Amino acid sequence: MSLNFNQKNAIELINGPCLILAGAGSGKTKVIINKIIYLINNCQYKPGNIIAVTFTNKAAHEIKVRLAKHLNLLQIKKMIISTFHSLGLEIIKKEINTLKFNSNFSLFDERDQMMLLKKICSKSIKNDTKLLKKLVFMISFWKNKFLTPLQVQLSAQSNLEKDFAFFYKQYTFHLRKSNILDFDDLICIPTSLLKNNQIIQNRWQKKISYLLVDEYQDTNNSQYELIKMLTNVNSNFTLVGDDDQSIYSWRGAKPQNLFLIKKDFPNLKIIKMEQNYRSYGRILKAANKLISNNLHYFKKKLFSNLEYGNKIKVIIGKNEKNEAEKIADKIIHECSNDIMQYKDYAILYRGNYQSQILEKTFLKKNIPYDISTNSSFFSRPEIKDLLSYLRLIVNPDDNHAFIRILNIPHRQIGLTTLNKLEELASKKNKSLFQISNDIEIKKILRERTVKKIKDFIYWIKKIIKLSLLKEDIILDKIINDIKYELWLTKILKEPKKIKTSINNIYTLSNWLKEMLRGNEFEKPMNLLQIVKKMTLRDILEKKIQINEIPKNRVQLMTLHSSKGLEFSSVFIIGMNEGILPNIKSINNDNIEEERRLTYVGMTRARKELFFTYCQTRIQYGQKLYTAPSRFLFELPQEDLQWEKDDYLDAFHTKEKKI
């Protein structure tokens, strides 16, 4: 184990609160892993009293895999190494009686949330996508500020604010009635419980001998409050973060939390990790120069003992097509001469729309590529269908699961019937499953329709009974009983799509069985726990690739998606004003986050870094002349190699006159 001076200090500082300012490529994961090992082997901490919190399941899994080389599997299983939301779920599960929730609650994802709000909102809001998205944002904002619907109603002033407050109240009522929690509840409910119940707070603080939090700069208000509730001024904990890599303010992240922790914990010790083990010196010099234009709570400057490296190239296209072709030609030249492999390259961009021209060009020039999208394995229709069946089995009051599967496959139960059921269920304050068993449905529905509903309910009850005895066969039983593969074949028609979807359902089935059995890192789980975990994973992960095998392909992804990754050669494309920084950030005077995003992209590169932009773009059918990004001029010009550009010549002429 080779550690530098600051890494060693960060690992061995155990007593009291500690903040590690870990620059890009400085080995933060290595420090987190070695600190856990040090706590157990050198300081005699019990694994069951150590909690490590990350932001993604992938990061949590990586920590477990790397710990397995040094600790035994029983020790790893005893630890809680999870995301914030999984930790919140664990607290809710343990304190379920105090919270007075039913233990078989379901979790809501974003699609469920939108579906419910469209159902309860007025036409003026549900038909206006912008307003509906604003309402979703406001509900999340209020929850993270720990504001109840009543508090929001009392402070509402405008008619829109009053409407939003009313729908927030309705939304909360529907969730509780259906025994459902949403994403924000997983942090806000346990935090509120710990705040308002000293006995429970003391118990959890006693349980946690040591807390570690990764990517601390990405915490929002409620996550920071949860950290405070799980610790006290004398607690032992380590937070690892980097204010220069805070790129998620749009989803509530507050880099100011790095400053607040110093205020709330006066005895906080700060350790800086500035040695970068990834990038050549020239890349780091440019990244340091760029980020120095931001205001900082803590000063930090990355350095490297690696070689200095070649100049950073600035490639200029006449238009978007020419920009993409120049990138493709550069990659083809280096790969055909065995200088590089396709997998050594990453193309990073601000928005997903920028990948379209690249894909078209790469296909034309036969360049193999993989594209990172925002789709999750669990958000695919066939997986959502089967998860909804499982959700209804573990929580029959889950109305949204009921609605999704009622006609999958077709049972000839129409929308009119469903509306009548919902109306009666609302009137009698029952779930759709409960009302389907009610004798009164005979008064509002035809006899033939009643029979179809009764048959469906009878079958669900049989599956529920079977699930109590044989959880491992339950998904296969559902797939076979409803003839789901046959139904997919009928609706998808295209052989390739059919094959992909059927492979996906077998992947889900195999994964379910593995989770029931447990594996080297995870304890066996029951069906209820698995359904919650899978739903939560869908919400948390932008992309999940099961059994991912590295392929010799160029990687295309957004700058946000690139965080935590590294590549030999990186292209950051679309370096134009209005794109990076994007127009919204320019108008809202939020340039600093765009600069941090560019910094993150630059520090993904190990050996080579390229910036590209184009002189003209087509927007709404109009040809527009576009200026190079201001960020290019904030870089050390002696380390850049520019292609000739008339705009740049004009810029330098103007600069000399000044």
Swiss-Prot record:
GO cellular component terms listed in the entry, alphabetical order: cytosol
Pfam family, one: UvrD-helicase
Binding-site positions, ATP: A22, G23, A24, G25, S26, G27, K28, T29, R278
Domain UvrD-like helicase ATP-binding: start-end pairs: 1-280
Signal peptide residue numbers: none
GO biological process, one term: DNA replication
Keywords annotated in UniProt: ATP-binding, DNA replication, DNA-binding, Helicase, Hydrolase, Isomerase, Nucleotide-binding
Transmembrane parts of this sequence: none
Enzyme Commission no: 5.6.2.4
Residue stretches making up the UvrD-like helicase C-terminal domain: 281-564
Reaction it catalyzes: Couples ATP hydrolysis with the unwinding of duplex DNA by translocating in the 3'-5' direction; ATP + H2O = ADP + phosphate + H(+)
One MF annotation (Gene Ontology) recorded for this entry: ATP binding
InterPro entries attached to this UniProt entry: DExx_box_DNA_helicase_dom_sf, DNA_helicase_UvrD-like_C, DNA_helicase_UvrD/REP, Helicase_Rep, P-loop_NTPase, UvrD-like_ATP-bd
SUPFAM superfamilies: P-loop containing nucleoside triphosphate hydrolases (SSF52540)
Family as reported in the entry's similarity comment: Belongs to the helicase family. UvrD subfamily.
Purpose: Rep helicase is a single-stranded DNA-dependent ATPase involved in DNA replication; it can initiate unwinding at a nick in the DNA. It binds to the single-stranded DNA and acts in a progressive fashion along the DNA in the 3' to 5' direction.
Quaternary state and interactors: Homodimer.
Protein name: ATP-dependent DNA helicase Rep
